[in-house]
Amino acid sequence: MAVTYRTPMEDIVNCFEPATQAVIANSAATLYKNFEEQHCQYFNYYLSPLAKRKLSMAGIYLSPYSAVVHSHPVCKTLENYILYSVLPSYINSSFYFVGIKERKLQLLKSKCKNLDSVQVVNRYVTSADRMRYTNDFVPYGSYEHECLVHKGVGLDNEALRGLVGPLRRHKAKNLFFHDELHYWSSKVLIDFLDVMRPDKLLGTVVYPPELLFKPTRSLNEWCYTYDIVGDTLMFFPDGVQSEGYQQPLKGGYLLGARSLKLPDGTVYMVDVLCSKFPHHLISITKGEAAAPTHRAFGPFEAVASEALKATLSPDYPCAFPVSYEVVNKIYRYLRTLKKPDEQSAIAKLSQIIAEPSGREIDFVECFARLVIHNSSMCATIMPEQLKEFMGNWLGKMPSVLARRFSSVRAVCVNKFIRGLKPYSFTLRLNEITWWNIWENSYAWFFDTDAEVDVPEKLDSLFMGEGAGLVAHITSRPYVGTVPLADREWNALLCMDSQKLLHAMRRMFMRGAWGAHMCVISREFLLKYVEARLKSSCLIAKARRRGQHKEKLEAWEVLGLKSSDALFRAMTYLCNARLEPMFSESGLRFFLTRGRNNLYGLTNYTEGKRAVTGVQNLWSNVVHEVSTKRHKGMIRLEKARVTEQPRSEFASCVLEPEVWRDVEAALDIELGEVACACNARFVQGVVLSNQAGLNVREQVAGASVGLYTKDRSNLKWGNSELLSNGWGRSLSVWMEINSVSQKFDVAVRLSYSKETQMNVLLPSLDGIERGAGATVVNLRKCGAFIVRCARGWRLALAWMDHICLEVMANVAYGHECYMRSWGTMDVVVFLKRATVSEQVTFESAQEVGPIEGKSDSGAPGVGVNLDLGGVVGSEYPANGAERYKRVSGPGDGCCCWHSFAYLVGMHHMELKRLCTSHVFENAALNVELEQCKASGAFVTHAAILATALRLRAEIRVHNAGTGRVHRFAPKQKNMALDLWLESEHYEPQVLRNGCVIESVAQALGTRNADILAVVEERCCEEVVESVQAGLGLNLHHVEIVLQCFDIVGHCNLGDKEITLNAGGKMPFCFDISDEHMSFCGRRKDPICKLVSGALHGKMFAESALLDLENCGLKIDFEPNWNRAGMLADSMYQGATGVLGSALFNNKRNMREKFVRNVSLSLHAIVGTFGSGKSTLFKNLLKYGAGKSLDFVSPRRALAEDFKRTVGMNERGGRAKAGQENWRVTTLETFLARVEFLTEGQVVILDEMQLYPPGYFDLVVSMLKVDVRLFLVGDPAQSDYDSEKDRLVLGAMEENMSVVLGAREYNYKVRSHRFLNCNFIGRLPCEINKDDCTIDEPHIMRMHLENLLDVAEEYKSVVLVSSFDEKMVVCAHLPEAKVLTFGESTGLTFMHGTIYISAVSERTNERRWITALRRFRFNLCFVNCSGMDYQQLAGRYKGRVRSKFLCKTAIPDDLNSMLPGQALFKSEYPRLIGKDEGVREEKLAGDPWLKTMINLYQAPEVEIAEEPEVVMQEEWFRTHLPRDELESVRAQWVHKILAKEYREVRMGDMVSEQFTHDHTKQLGAKQLTNAAERFETIYPRHRASDTVTFLMAVKKRLSFSNPGKEKGNLFHAASYGKALLSEFLKRVPLKPNHNVRFMEEALWNFEEKKLSKSAATIENHSGRSCRDWPTDVAQIFSKSQLCTKFDNRFRVAKAAQSIVCFQHAVLCRFAPYMRYIEMKVHEVLPKNYYIHSGKGLEELDAWVKKGKFDRICTESDYEAFDASQDEFIMAFELELMKYLRLPSDLIEDYKFIKTSLGSKLGNFAIMRFSGEASTFLFNTLANMLFTFMRYNIRGDEFICFAGDDMCASRRLQPTKKFAHFLDKLKLKAKVQFVQFVNKPTFCGWHLCPDGIYKKPQLVLERMCIAKEMNNLSNCIDNYAIEVAYAYKLGEKAVNRMDEEEVAAFYNCVRIIVRNKHLIRSDVKQVFEVL
């Protein structure tokens, strides 16, 4: 497939011979030359790249040589385009130009020769015109034209004043206005056309077209901007404020006009001939003709926002000012990311736009957030119609509400993307007529529908259906201006003043006046009326007579004569409606029937809050005030009665006439009534009926309650009444109701209407009858009947609570009865002795008799009392056997314990809740306050508060009385039963209440709640069965389930049934042995109802296969003996506590063994921090709703895992999607094993910490197959418990059973540690690139220094035993102190390890566990009595010693691991190689992420090549023994003093040679400080200023871009010749290779991403677009210069490194690799480029080349700085030859010629760090060699950058000598005999192969030993020595004495330290 499309003509031309192509090109060049000559002067302004692209796409020619600067080049180019390219095709010599400069007209005439006779008419309109036109301009002056008189002031306009006369004199019919029409209003234009009547009028208009739909900001900011100031527009060309000018906002009306209609009906058509952004060419032609009805504008640099309307703020414009390309790219980019984020979106924006605007940044941030948090929606194929419907429907709501719905957001995003395109709009054109000139303001300041014809709409609304019959108004000319001047002025709106006055009065009465405003201010009233009139613009407030205008006063507007009349008219109604204040009324307030000012007189809270006490008191006042009084009427009737003794309790039946008297008494008023016997009865008002007196006993059909002040009992006939004391509230109540305080006995009576009772109680003993009595009626309706012994009777009644005071003289000889239609409820006060106070119920009110059911269901009779909002009653108890009591503690809180047991709360919390209740009655609050004390007994007030707070019906079964006390609130949710015996409460539950309990467990609520619902909703039969405690049949069970909408899946053992199948909530129950239990979520999978069901909670098979591939598959067969031993230990309480029979009443788990067949499980093992848990955490990211059990041996590990995956802590509600995730400990999980579902995932984490036999126990109890994973590190702490050590200690460990005889992969690389110091100290692999710090660990001595360590190290302390834990806790009480074993699986940032003498006895696994816990660093506190050196010796060979000595290797784990472990660095992957890896690595560099392809690596099957097994020649090599010191003695004298070797610059001195020993821990001192091996070579450091300046001076060359571009231009002609010379030796193929390009791109990105994520993030600043591409940063390379030539030398210049912007590298690097592949594709066999190849390939090539003669080497001086313009010309021709993109070549030219830094601009040269450095250096080296020497073709030549070596003596040639002299590149030729060891890249070349110079290797190994770094680099040194070692005697024979001695010492060091070697090279040095 072609990279770019070519037209057929292009293909044909490319097929021609070059000569033919040149002929065609000449013709095209001539055409282009002529075109450029014509247009260059108009379109040669310097433009930005964006402006170039926009203008070119708009069809505007731009000169390729655009260098002329201008303040606003874009708008100037557009103006020239309209004026010089578009306009000439529409005009001729007949046109008159108006408002144009002479210079522009002359340019136009020079371009168009037919415009020579065009004349210009200019005039002064603005002050700037005086300077705009030339000095020879003469303004016209003339007499006023008659047309001006005809138009009156119409043509007296600045634009027309000096224009009409000259044009009429010239009889101009064709006109052109230059940039002027946008200043004219539509009226001015119509007046002008009406006077001039031109045939054609052309004009240029500058007006932003987007203003037609009213955005306040420009949508083409690259071209222009504008501001709206009032009704004017400030237009800024190119956004340059200083070049802006002001014009009318309405100036664009012609863009929306179709025609113009003059007063006489003449029509002018309007057309837009050309529209380019804000510049338009408009044509106005005379005569009506066909024309379009709509006009379109666009596209703009914006996208429509209509689709996102529901998510936007109301003031957001109709378009987003962001280009379509930006939105499109960012959306597609975010959708391709696996983990999109806002940073990536902003980085992508910076990549697309170098300098984005603030509006673009804001939009991208918000848009990215919207896209990221809302998934895409299908609306085309398989549309999500429900989601779309909900989104559209909810989107109709206000945006502030709509955007909160996810469906609305998803639909909005979908609509936005589906309709995404550059914003444009279509405008409906209108006709501008002379009579409806709106000045174009209508379109701007009002919203109008483009499809509505406003005049027709108004006509239809005004005329109704007959609007169509009315002829439209036709236009006609004016007939003169006289009527306009003489016509009388009339108001447009007339209003009746009388109606206006009425309206004003109503407004005043309702809004300003109040019913209690006694005085009205005259001034206030007048100001009020004036303000109201002023606010209306439709009411005439002035009188006009001719030219005189007179202001009207307010009263004149209202039709009144004076202000007094206004005041009277406004206030005459106020006095009639005035209401007196309460303070003014006094007592009259209570007597008047009219009520006003009643706010606050209700007995309920009117405000938001009110204090309860105030509310209660106020309700009493309200009751008192609201009592009605009527005039009384007393009826006395004498009756004949026989004198006979009567008993008080004798039946007293009132005659019908007496009842009539009672009924009549309902209308009488209270008063003092006298009997015929002079007995007096005084009636009074009961202000409060809340007596607070209860009835306790039954006497002769009445409920009686006795209250005495002295607490004495009284006799009533044969019965003794027990005194209830005398509460303080009773005295208060008596005082409120005006009952005399002399009474000290109160009797509460409650009886039915059938019972007749003399309320004066003559049978009550101990009463002083002469003291009189007071009887209080507590009922609202009733009547007192008084019988006199003389035969008189009185009927005294009242409609409300009354009291009757019987005077002392009527105590004898009278009877008093109470009659009512309901229950009688009275209180009788009598005189006796003083009685003491006792707290009782103080707010009881009888509410009626009980006619309900008792416990047994039999009818019971009792009395209901309203006790503070709770109805209290009492009835006989029956059926106590239906309940079972639960024993409770008798600690004084037994009642609270009972309540707490029934409701499931803590008793103290429940007590605090209930005792905090506030009653309406103060006495109850006092009594409740006493219950708050600790150990206080519960009173009735506490029970009432509990009933109210819990909304519970409380039934107290009193064992002493055999009755049930019932307390029921008005709203109840549950029923609670208590047993009271001997002042001790116990909770009662129904016998056989398993149904209630099962339903409660299923719904997660309390039994009491379920019971209350059952009693309320179920039928009587079910309720009786429940209350009887006899159990329920299945039919009744189904009825109960129906109440809660539960589908009950019931397992009956032999069968399964479903109850209430129509319910909504399915639950499983088990019914066996007449007992029902809830199965919960742990459904038994054996149950047929769920067995085999596809429950949809299984993980995807692909995800599990990937996971299983990371571990070892094991067919595990459970051992019932091992499982049984662990089960017995747990049953006995030796192992754990949850499975104990003693502590938790558990059964032995042996009974649950059901499985003896094998189960496939997978073991995933790896070292600490290897990512084992991360595998499952990643799995859970896609496990929403899936079933998983994660088991941890430690509670801390379980909680840590919960926090990591985002699960709630214990007791919290599970998040959506996590309902089926269970994180448990090992004991809790055993209770779930038998209920696991088939196929679910079970993970046993930290498998080495489980007790022996645990895996056998789990598998033995499994009823179904599950996906079981064992995860852990067998090398860490194992299980150990002192309690079961004797029982389980003899059993084999779990790890040995599972892995003992198997070979398995063990991941040895750890990702936990971020400190380089841990490398070599821990037995694992640590990637150095992952480490971000390099800090040594801290070592402290003695316990007292524990307090001195840094705070971060004090947070966690690890100890080896529990005894040490106590010691550390005493010193650091705030620290988290853990034993080594307890810390297993946990990770900390910093911490401390405490070492004591006991620590020595800790096994290796626990030591490994402790040392691996800390990511950053750790501190040791040594309290063992030994120093650290002694400690290392004492622990020799152990993990602790290897940590201190830095000698740990992964092989140390072999002794701790069971079976045969195969160490691997990574877990294997099955499918999707590298998926998401790139994106994760680039998380810290969002800018680079936009430059890198994020696709995954292709799956390529690697072909296995057969390995050739050859018998290598081997024999022993005898090396002469030579000590290291004797080797050193041969050259030590060559080391000069430091002061002679360093370089001085001013007062600065270089620092390249060391003279001190290193302070690195573990370093070895091989020599004295001044003669260290490191001193042999210079060391360059980035901090060495002198070394850096030396590098700048030697290796960099500076120039300026202009000079370098000129040099390159002159050198470009040599490029093709150089390339042809190169192609003679290396015949490159020019065709494009797609595979090479893909591989090159992939290889570059892989190399770029091979660094760690931390390193990439640290260099993210290089990716930001704020770093200019043509600016680089210069560094000096930090390195030890270990070339052989650098031994014993003085200081040398550093190697400079240039740091480029990442965009530059990503631009060029893939193509450089592509060129390299093209070179390697055709490279001859005898040429070798050492790039991307190993030493084995070099060795094999050298053997083929037979380097056995005189060889040629080239040594270049300043090679990089010598890569001048001639070499670059060769590079450019090479890129063109390989058909690389031309824009890439231009970018390469730009970078090479324009690159600069803080030091200045560079000349053309090569830089280290440039993408093409090595490749082009090598190619330049090859080209120079081909031109410098006579190459025959059979030479073997190897190249690598600036290094070259040929196998023969190459003869120089003079053929290109003249050209080579021009090059900066110079070479020193060396001819080396093979015995003198020719060198290439530091390797000696010989016929037998390659080998490294031994002195270099030895000295570098000694330097590593001095730095304690040998373990990190010995592999590399061993590889270098191995080539000479394998050559044996062949290499020794070519070495001199010094080299042999060095070679021996190299081999000796390697053999002694071969245990540090990690690679296979170790085998070379092992003895066969």
From Swiss-Prot:
Specific enzymatic cleavages by the viral protease yield mature proteins. Residues 883-991 form the OTU domain. It comes from the Viruses. ATP binds at G1166, T1167, F1168, G1169, S1170, G1171, K1172, S1173. One of its GO terms (biological process) is methylation. Keywords: ATP-binding, Dioxygenase, Helicase, Hydrolase, Methyltransferase, Multifunctional enzyme, Nucleotide-binding, Nucleotidyltransferase, Oxidoreductase, Protease, RNA-directed RNA polymerase, Thiol protease, Transferase, Viral RNA replication. SUPFAM superfamilies: DNA/RNA polymerases, P-loop containing nucleoside triphosphate hydrolases. It catalyses: RNA(n) + a ribonucleoside 5'-triphosphate = RNA(n+1) + diphosphate; ATP + H2O = ADP + phosphate + H(+). The active site is at C994, H1075. Pfam families: Peptidase_C23 (PF05379), RdRP_2 (PF00978), Viral_helicase1 (PF01443), Vmethyltransf (PF01660). Its EC number is 2.1.1.-, 1.14.11.-, 3.4.22.-, 2.7.7.48. Residues 63-254 form the Alphavirus-like MT domain. The record marks G1472, K1473 as: Cleavage. One of its GO terms (molecular function) is dioxygenase activity. Belongs to the potexviruses/carlaviruses RNA replication protein family. Protease: Thiol protease that cleaves the polyprotein. This is RNA replication polyprotein. It comes from Potato virus M (strain Russian) (PVM).
